[in-house]
């Protein structure tokens, strides 16, 4: 009994009993209600039997850092679009300057008069003739020509590279004195060796490019049944149109491989007349069907082979265009050369100093008519009065709208496209 009482007291102590009911039962007073502020009870001091399990708060997963969105590469602007945009930003003066190829006298430096024309009108292209080459120098004129072309470029009024041209055909038209002889067109035609023609013109182009010349006005693609009865003579490759085409295309390839533009001439053909367009306006009474069957064959093949330029002759073909010499004829330049043959390169007129042109129109009118017919580059040698007249005519025609901005830009784009082939310049 005594043991039972001891157990009961121990139980009361453990349970933190707060009192006893009248009927002798033990009453449990919860700890949160057993005491009052300031009153210490057994419930307040006794350790609880059970401790509530701690609430488990899961550690949040680290938020992944998103990969940065890569900046998309800008879409490259096609060169054709860049070129058109560049031309649209040029001044009229700069554009007109790209449409002329002028010459001057002198072998050492640009004359002061021509230097002023280059500066005033932003002349974009230059032609050299025999009078510019010191062929009697020990090296045949090459070193002095390199110095001359450097001076020419120093006078350029824009950062657009110049086309610097010359005509080296071989035979009687060589300009320099060549250490290793370059044979004439007739000899190439007689051998009918296209590979020999390609190698010769590749060598010519390499030598020209090394002295600062990037355009060769060659080869001659005129054909004639009897070349001796024409003023071109041995400059003609062959009386056979197929042979002339084959050798001519090889020459074009060689020039391009050597770093030069190739300008074939004299479209649509100078071989059916004995008259010299330097002195008079030749008249050739042949219809278009005859021309297509013979005279036009070498030109069509050269265009297909990728010739860079075509020079047009000052000859009247009344059965094709009774009102205009070929160089001023929309029929020849736009309908036939560009339309039928698909030519997209440069169209140059033969030298504007020639009587074959000047007997047909004033220089101002001729320059405008040439551009309107579809031409791109007006060529004029060392006559600075003529050059100013040409520039005056073109400037007035652009200002009064005779030559539209669209037509002007079209030719400038062609000229700049050609320049990119022989330089590292880009718009």
Model-derived segments and their meaning:
Residues 2-10:
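Sec-dependent signal peptide recognition
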Residues 13-16:
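C-terminal motif of bacterial Sec signal peptides marking the signal peptidase cleavage site
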Residues 18-56, 61, 66-177:
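N-terminal hydrophobic targeting/anchoring segments and the immediately downstream early-domain regions
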Residues 98, 122-124, 158-162, 213-214, ...:
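Short, well-ordered coil/turn segments that N-cap beta-strands
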Residues 114-115, 205, 248, 252, ...:
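Generic hydrophobic/aromatic pocket-lining and core-packing "Φ" positions
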Residues 117-244, 266, 271-287, 313-327, ...:
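Enzymes and membrane/adaptor proteins characterized by extended Gly/Ser/Thr/Asp/Glu-rich
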Residues 247-264, 290-307:
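Phosphate/pyrophosphate-binding betaalpha-module
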Residues 402-427:
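Mid-to-C-terminal alpha-helical segments outside catalytic/metal-binding sites
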């Amino acid at each position: 009994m005594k043991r039972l009482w001891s157990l009961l007291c121990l139980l009361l102590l453990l349970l933190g009993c707060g009192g006893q009911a009248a009927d002798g039962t033990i009453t449990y007073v919860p700890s949160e209600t057993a005491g009052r502020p300031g009153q210490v009870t057994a419930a307040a001091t006794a350790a609880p039997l059970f401790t509530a399990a701690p609430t488990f708060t899961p550690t949040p997963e680290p938020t992944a850092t998103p990969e940065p969105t890569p900046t998309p590469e800008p879409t490259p602007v096609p060169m054709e679009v860049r070129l058109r945009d560049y031309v649209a930003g040029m001044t009229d003066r700069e554009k007109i300057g790209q449409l002329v190829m002028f010459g001057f006298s002198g072998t050492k430096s640009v004359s002061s008069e021509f230097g002023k024309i280059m500066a005033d009108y932003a002349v974009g292209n230059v032609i050299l003739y025999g009078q510019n080459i010191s062929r009697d120098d020990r090296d045949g004129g090459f070193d002095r020509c390199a110095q001359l072309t450097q001076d020419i470029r120093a006078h350029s009024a824009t950062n657009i590279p110049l086309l610097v041209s010359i005509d080296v055909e071989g035979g009687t038209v060589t300009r320099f004195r060549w250490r290793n002889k370059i044979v004439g067109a007739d000899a190439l035609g007689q051998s009918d060796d296209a590979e020999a023609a390609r190698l010769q013109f590749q060598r010519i182009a390499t030598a020209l490019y090394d002295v600062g010349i990037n355009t060769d006005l060659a080869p001659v693609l005129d054909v004639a049944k009897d070349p001796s009865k024409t003023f071109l003579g041995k400059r003609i490759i062959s009386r056979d149109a197929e042979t002339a085409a084959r050798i001519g295309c090889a020459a074009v390839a060689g020039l391009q491989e050597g770093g030069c533009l190739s300008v074939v001439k004299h479209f649509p053909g100078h071989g059916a007349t004995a008259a010299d367009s330097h002195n008079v306006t030749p008249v050739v009474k042949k219809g278009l069907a005859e021309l297509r069957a013979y005279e036009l064959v070498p030109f069509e093949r050269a265009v297909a082979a990728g010739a860079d330029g075509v020079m047009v002759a000052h000859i009247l073909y009344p059965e094709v265009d009774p009102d205009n010499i070929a160089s001023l004829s929309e029929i020849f330049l736009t309908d036939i050369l560009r339309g039928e043959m698909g030519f997209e390169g440069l169209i140059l007129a033969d030298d504007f100093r020639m009587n074959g042109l000047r007997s047909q129109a004033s220089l101002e009118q001729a320059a405008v008519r040439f551009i309107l017919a579809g031409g791109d580059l007006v060529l004029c040698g060392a006559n600075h009065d003529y050059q100013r007249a040409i520039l005056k005519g073109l400037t007035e025609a652009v200002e009064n709208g005779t030559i539209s901005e669209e037509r002007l830009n079209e030719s400038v784009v062609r000229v700049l496209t050609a320049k990119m082939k022989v330089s590292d310049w880009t718009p």
